[in-house]
């Protein structure tokens, strides 16, 4: 006879709560290459879980479409160039990033703005305009973001964190 069923999502939420001063009500957002999951915990109970069929690759594809850069070049730029809203308008990506690619004059600010626009859109879809979560976003103070292992670029993480912070978390 089965007495209890524990979901992996619930256990992960318990670990997040325990490692963050026993916070009881929060969102956990896990963003992987091709999918995103959101978990809503209220009073230490898993209340809601939803999957989305997009992830960090959508950001790389957007940058690639607009700038015509290859994925490897984009990843190098994200790893080595500081991208934020303080970038001068005329500052270009350095030539040393174009090893297997022809050099193009691409503004760092453009790459930042592409990322920011997509991150804002992602945040709205999964949290702020998600009809399944409208009642829970009003009083929520904690959100925990996990990016996939392959895509741990500090720039992207900071843009995600700043976007959620600006929206009220």
Please describe what each predicted stretch is:
Residues 66, 80, 84, 129-133, ...:
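Conserved, well-folded catalytic cores of nucleic-acid-processing
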Residues 10, 41-124, 138, 145-153:
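Phosphate-binding glycine-rich/basic clefts of nucleotide- and phosphate-handling proteins
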Residues 1-26, 47, 108-112, 133-136, ...:
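Nucleotide/phosphate-binding catalytic cleft detector across ATP-hydrolyzing
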Residues 14, 60, 157:
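Generic structural marker for isolated residues within well-ordered, non-membrane alpha-helices
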Residues 1, 122, 127-129:
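Conserved phosphate-binding loops in N-terminal lobes of ATP-dependent enzymes
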Residues 18-49, 63:
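Gly/Thr-rich phosphate-binding beta-strand-loop-beta motif of the actin/hexokinase/Hsp70
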Residues 15, 34, 147-148:
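Glycine-centered small-residue hotspots that permit tight backbone geometry or close packing
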Residues 144-169:
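Charge-rich, low-complexity intrinsically disordered segments
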């Amino acid at each position: 006879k089965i007495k209890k069923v524990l979901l992996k999502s619930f256990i992960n939420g318990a670990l997040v709560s325990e490692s963050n001063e026993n916070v009881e009500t929060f969102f956990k957002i896990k963003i992987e290459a091709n999918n995103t999951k959101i978990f809503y915990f209220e009073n230490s109970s898993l209340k809601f879980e939803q999957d989305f069929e997009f992830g960090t690759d959508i950001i790389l594809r957007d940058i690639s479409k607009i700038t015509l850069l290859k994925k490897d070049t984009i990843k190098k730029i994200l790893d080595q160039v500081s991208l934020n809203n303080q970038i001068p308008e005329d500052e270009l990506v350095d030539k040393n990033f174009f090893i297997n690619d022809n050099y193009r004059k691409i503004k760092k600010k453009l790459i930042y703005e592409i990322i920011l626009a997509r991150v804002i859109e992602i945040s709205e879809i999964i949290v702020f305009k998600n009809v399944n979560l409208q009642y829970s976003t009003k009083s929520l103070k904690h959100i925990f973001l996990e990016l996939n292992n392959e895509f741990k670029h500090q720039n992207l993480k900071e843009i995600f964190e700043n976007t959620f912070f600006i929206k009220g978390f």
